[in-house]
Amino acid sequence: MAEIMHVFAREIMDSRGNPTVEAEVFLDDGSHGVAGVPSGASTGVHEAHELRDGGDRYLGKGVLKAVENVNEEIGDELAGLEADDQRLIDAAMIKLDGTENKSRLGANAILGVSMAVAKAAADSAGLPLFRYIGGPNAHVLPVPMMNIINGGAHADSGVDVQEFMIAPIGFDSFSEALRAGAEVYHALKKVINEKGLSTGLGDEGGFAPSVESTRAALDLIVEAIKKAGFEPGKDIALALDVASSEFFKDGKYHFEGGEHTAEEMANVYAELVDEYPIVSIEDPLQEDDWDGYVALTAQIGDKVQIVGDDFFVTNPARLKEGIAKKAANSILVKVNQIGTLTETFDAVDMAHRAGYTSMMSHRSGETEDTTIADLAVALNCGQIKTGAPARSDRVAKYNQLLRIEQLLGDAAVYAGRSAFPRFQG
């Protein structure tokens, strides 16, 4: 296999106008890979450390230190290593960093190189990235979890829940599911307009109307699904990313004008699941509320996917504890939460072996990089969350999945309803 010859990084811009790291890896056979690193708005306290410069430049958000760490340390460490040994390469960067959360070199520096190495190795092997990572059995296209109403930390809409998503489950192909999602998105704009509400967009391309409650937002989406000619629950289901750590203060959940305990929030979710065709609820409780997650999973986990994002932070150690305690039943997969592809692979593998589902995910600050689209297919996630069918930073991932589906031809299988085995709607 080709050896790593040169590693280089630069500072580029993300979709929120903030700097991020882009890494390039060149191999001795002329192959090369490039990768841009995403960044989140609502970040878990247990995430790998994103290194920022501080100071006045870019309001403290510059990443020149991370870029320097790639160009002056990581590149020298990896020179001469075989590019197809992803585990060895990632382990070398983790060892070089020397901290538990990648805070010395920066997870943004390490991840950029980790992804670029995989792309360079795929280029050298003459394979698309999904095939290089996933092997011959990578053929399942994920359900697009399309965030069409933005709230919480992603918008100024006033609603506490961060994301209201649609899941087009009743279709035979990814391309048809994407079409249906886009049609609902456009129908939703009309519904919002007709009610005299704002059609301004949040960070992830979803609308950010000022609505009074979670139910009001869900009602808008159900109306849009019907307006587009689809049946809620049969053709298109609903999903939530509550991001509840964002409104957890002083031991209480400050939700929709009241202060609630974990038990009370669990009852709120149970009622919503009974009233609406909801297949998935992400981060329903604060990220360290282990007892609450265990109780919630026991209460409604047999009929809805309970996803750990801030709760698990794509970390195999936290996931292992969750599996042992039967806390949640699904993991959100964000490569920059853990900082290397290898650790991401390990988390997804652990989840699937335990019967947990997995959802590949973008961040609210994205680039045109499409790595997560390939990863969703390679790792057989069955679900991908990468925003509304709007804004090029989101649509880039959907377009890559369309290319993958076309490349697979008759071998392509759309996950559809099978991605949500607990859903009875």
Curated annotation (Swiss-Prot):
It is found in: Cytoplasm; Secreted; Cell surface. Its main location: cytoplasm. It holds the Pfam family Enolase_N. GO terms for molecular function: magnesium ion binding; phosphopyruvate hydratase activity. (2R)-2-phosphoglycerate binds at residues 162, 334, 363-364, 385. Its cofactor is Mg(2+). It is an enzyme of class 4 (lyase). GO terms for biological process: glycolytic process. Keywords: Cytoplasm, Glycolysis, Lyase, Magnesium, Metal-binding, Secreted. It catalyses: (2R)-2-phosphoglycerate = phosphoenolpyruvate + H2O. Its EC number is 4.2.1.11. Gene3D superfamilies: Enolase-like C-terminal domain, Enolase-like, N-terminal domain. Binds a second Mg(2+) ion via substrate during catalysis. Pathway: Carbohydrate degradation; glycolysis; pyruvate from D-glyceraldehyde 3-phosphate: step 4/5. InterPro entries: Enolase, Enolase-like_C_sf, Enolase-like_N, Enolase_C, Enolase_CS, Enolase_N. Mg(2+) binds at residues 241, 282, 309. Coiled coil: none annotated. GO terms for cellular component: cell surface; extracellular region; phosphopyruvate hydratase complex. Belongs to the enolase family. HAMAP family: Enolase (MF_00318). Catalyzes the reversible conversion of 2-phosphoglycerate (2-PG) into phosphoenolpyruvate (PEP). It is essential for the degradation of carbohydrates via glycolysis. This is Enolase. The gene is eno.
